[in-house]
């Protein structure tokens, strides 16, 4: 009898601990421009490139009892084609024509400089997370150069630990805000059009 009771307690304790551990999440966010842009170009060609300047695809951890097992990541292979499509769409909205090999055309390089997800380290339950995204935009037009950094952040509170779909949406939202902020900078359109 005592043996069964002890076994039952061990089983319940094991399930409780498992409930506090979070598995890793590989996110596939969909960044999108979320505000209209003002056209300043007349269809001139622009070479558009994107790069991943992050030191690692890992954004951070989901926290919880064992944060080292709960990494959140976004791979460069997943995010770069989406950023390329959005950067080209932004250049079109600004009135220019994205062109892969245009000779002597202005160049715009969008670099994902930082993407972070931080949740409190203490405590068994994830109740909030801070997400930040930073892009660097480099524009070169003949001898003129411009470089700017554009960021966005988001603090989200949760009633329970967020699932993969929730984190994917939140990271996509913060990427979208930073991306839109970058292309709303009038200096970029002016530099491309000179």
Task: Give names to the regions the model predicted.
Residues 21-29, 94-147, 153-161:
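Surface-exposed short loop/turn segments
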Residues 73-100:
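Mid-chain, structured segments of secreted extracytoplasmic proteins
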Residues 66-78, 142-193:
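Short secondary-structure boundary motifs at beta->alpha junctions and helix caps
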